[in-house]
Amino acid sequence: MQATAVVETDSDKSYHKNGGHLQNDKLYYPKKENMLFSNGCNRVKLTFPDGEGDSLTTDERTNVKENSSVDKRDLSELSFSETQDTNVENLFSQSSEFEDNIEYAFLNETYSIHYSESKLKDENILHLYSELDPEVHERVEVFFDTFGPQGNNDIGLGRSCEALGSACGDMQKSDVREDSQQEYHSAELECLSAHLAVDPAKTVSRSSLDVSEWRTSSYTFKCGGNLEVNRGKLESGPIPFLESLNGFSPKCSPQVSTSPSSDMLKEYHEPKYEKYKEQEVGLTYHKTFDDILQRSSSPLNSQKVPEPLVYAKEMKSQTIEGKDFYGDRIFQNRALQHPENAMFPQDHALETPLKALDAHQLSGPYVLDDSVISLCGSLQYNSLPEPGFYSPVMPRVAVTDSQAEVAGSCLHHVQGSATNKTCSLMKEMCLKSGPDAANCVALGQQTLDVSGRANVSSSVVSTASTTETKTVRRSQPEEWQRDRQSVACNTDWSCGQQCRSARAAALGSDSGRPLSTDCLNCGNSMDENSLELRKTPDKQRHPERAFQLCEEMALPSKCCEKTTERAVKAETHLLDVCYQMCHHHCHHIYKLVMGSRAGLSRNLPTDSAQKELGTALLSVLEDLKARYMNLKGKVHKGIPLEELPPLSVESKLLSAFSDFASRLMKEEACSLSGANSELDNQSLPEVAISPSLLKTLSQMSSISDSSHPKQDKLPMNNIFKNCDINIDFNHLKLNDKESKNVHEASEDWFDATERLTGTDFSVTQENITESEDWDPKNPLESELKTIERLRRGKGFLIHVGGLCPSVSEADLRSHFQKYQVSEISIYDSNTNYRYASLACAKNSNAKMAVKEMNGVEINGKSVNVRLVKIPGEYIPPLLSTAGNNISMNHLERNSSKDATSAASTCRLPIARSGQLESEQDSEFLPLVQGVRENCNQVKSGQSLPETPFQFIPPHTLNLRSFTKIMKRLAELHPEISRDHIIEALQEVRINHKGFLNGLSINTIVKMTSSFLRNAASRLK
């Protein structure tokens, strides 16, 4: 029977070849007249008329080769003949017509073939497995390929006829003798029985593949339509043609589509060959199945898959073909024995499983190009020129030492005579396919070397999205998988122990058993490596680039890690600062409240307040620490600090202390400068309990508050409440300049003719006696005691202030030697202010010292010298020393010419009427005892004022003269308020260089009255 192939390249032309003669005529098909396909695509029609069984002779094949030298021939067809027994009928019937949508990519390009569902036009089923005469083994089938691009009528097949003649010439030389064929029948039968599957559910149909080598000249073709134009150039030389397409069993791969030819065989043989099994020995034929066709709506169909180079080793072989019919399924086994030198050192078996989609169906038999082995329609093979003869043997894959690791194929490095080949590198990247084109599988198994039975399984799973290539060698299975690394997109060289176990079990039980779906899906985890795969060829040629690439890939992660660590460290430090601030705030509030506890203890017992306050503070600190540790842990976990709640503290103080600040401000803001109280000249306690004394005591209390918050301040606060004194704490601290001004502004408001020595000091003497029992432990109290002792012994004191640190007692004695200084005492303070007290025996010497030495420089620094005691006056030490310069400070502050500024300053209380005087006299007596108790509680030696305690002249305490002056001025200017009169007195003092000493009361009244009249005239 002779097979005739007709290829029609456009709508009106077809080329017919019969027996090697080319005819440019219209093909007439006796049964099917419609030879044209829709969509303007190229048509392929295969006819096998019955009764034509003559084979081509050698001369005819030579003629074919000569006639095929015509350039630009749009025809590629092969004729093959097989001798068949007369008993076999209808071996090949009319083939089916297909609507084809074909893409081809050639040499470094990809192609995909889309076939629509096959429409079987004939009821005669193609018999793939029929009984043939053993003599057919000497005849070799000829392959032919038909390229049909979509939407393009050009088929650039070049010199395909010439290639056909060359291939036929090689086939004639490589025919296998009948004698050599019969020798292997027995061995092949034994191998066939061993590899033949018994269980129909686990057996897959297999078709063996042969290799054909064509020597063709270079040509170029295009693919039209909506597909990308692909150009390929095929080099001259032998091209191995490997085909192995088998269908999986339903158990292994549920998505395997059944070939229409298999279904037809099932329908044809089911009534006739039920439970029938036969084996046919000694036939050589070429069977070509269609490749797995992808029909996916995804635009990712035209994806590119690795392109390995496959080389064939010419050798003689004999095949044993077996086919089984189990009810509704047909299984075929074929073994190929290699009597000559094999390419692998060990005998191996090659199996090529391919996974198919449910939506794709295998069409009827058609012919693929010999230079392309399509695994899932994406693999591409290229061959280099190699002399040799045609031999229908299995292809051999080999690599050189430099290319033992090849992308896209699992090629084993082999040492042998015929291994001087090179494997192709990855030329294209696998694109990620859609979900409907991800599981295309086909299984092809080939058995090598029946006698050895040492199997090497090379499983190639090629899909649009997953390509899994495995090679297992029995002697070194672990080493191979450990040394090989995937360099292709979605290519996994080692599927793990599970895949190896499944494959070993499949090979041990039956070589035809397909791999498990788990093994086929192992390559799905390689989608992320597509970026790295582009650089794999460079890594193979330049190993140093791989190390550089690793460093570059690791650099961003290290940089990000360091940046994150720095950010966490900075936020942790900021959180620590916030915690310390909150902690300090809690302690500050505690000290402040405890310092004022004495003033508030009139409503709360002291012990109860202290306990409750301490408990509240501990609770606040514990809660603060807990929230701090919680925030710190979250920061270490990577949560930004700005997204966390701020670290704050809430004061859980007692309700009794909650209004402490408001009450304190209220007491400070309270001013009773408009009081009309006047002190009587008959009451000595009026002089003793003067406002200056009260302010001095308040200064002492504030000093002790800042150093010892826990000390009681009850006497001080009682004085504040009972006397209603306006205390401005901001003016209790003086700098050196203010101190000098205070010393210079010693106010001697007294009448020169008035002497106060006749006054009874009985009450004050009692206080003096009690004050001698004090336990002075700070410099302030020591100074008071020293002054008291000096006053009693000498009676005349001189204050020398502003001493530099280098001034010693000897220096002062040398400067004040002519003034007959009997005793010198030097005092230091924390503010680097030093002063000295000098005792003079005579009043004249003291006055002369003040007049001459005031402003004199001692060791480079000028000093201010003032007189402390005036002759004829004896003031109790406590009262005289307690009268601080605070009263002078108040007068100094209120010396501003602006009348509005004077209203906000502290003012000295004015004596009221006689009734008020008697009331105050009764209140002042117990307050003096409170002052003594308060002074007894001063324990620390570190509680020194920022400025030293200044000695105030005793005339400041003589309020009787001040009362007289205010009374006279009020009588002269009744329309002027008391505040304005006091401001006028201050202005007079400032205009008189800050001193009113030596001026009589009448002079002071005249000067003040004149100032008031001038001010009133200016206002008008």
Curated annotation (Swiss-Prot):
Primary location: cytoplasm
Residues that span the membrane, as ranges: none
GO function term, MF aspect, one: protein homodimerization activity
Matching Pfam families: RRM_1 (PF00076), TTC3_9th (PF24905)
Oxidoreductase is among the record's keywords: no
Entry GO terms, CC: catalytic step 2 spliceosome; cytoplasm; intercellular bridge
Lineage: superkingdom: Eukaryota
Segments of skewed composition (Basic and acidic residues): 58-70
UniProt keyword terms in alphabetical order: Cytoplasm, Phosphoprotein, RNA-binding
InterPro entries: Nucleotide-bd_a/b_plait_sf, RBD_domain_sf, RRM_dom, TTC3/DZIP3/RBM44-like_helical
Domain RRM, residue spans: 796-870
Residues covered by region (Disordered): 1-23, 50-70
GO terms of biological process kind: mRNA splicing, via spliceosome
Subcellular localization: Cytoplasm
Modification Phosphoserine, positions: 249, 371, 374, 516, 683, 690
Tagged with keyword Ligase: no
Function: Component of intercellular bridges during meiosis. Intercellular bridges are evolutionarily conserved structures that connect differentiating germ cells. Not required for fertility.
Quaternary data: Homodimer. Interacts with TEX14.
The protein, known as: RNA-binding protein 44
Species of origin: Rattus norvegicus (Rat)
Lineage, opening ranks: Eukaryota, Metazoa, Chordata, Craniata, Vertebrata
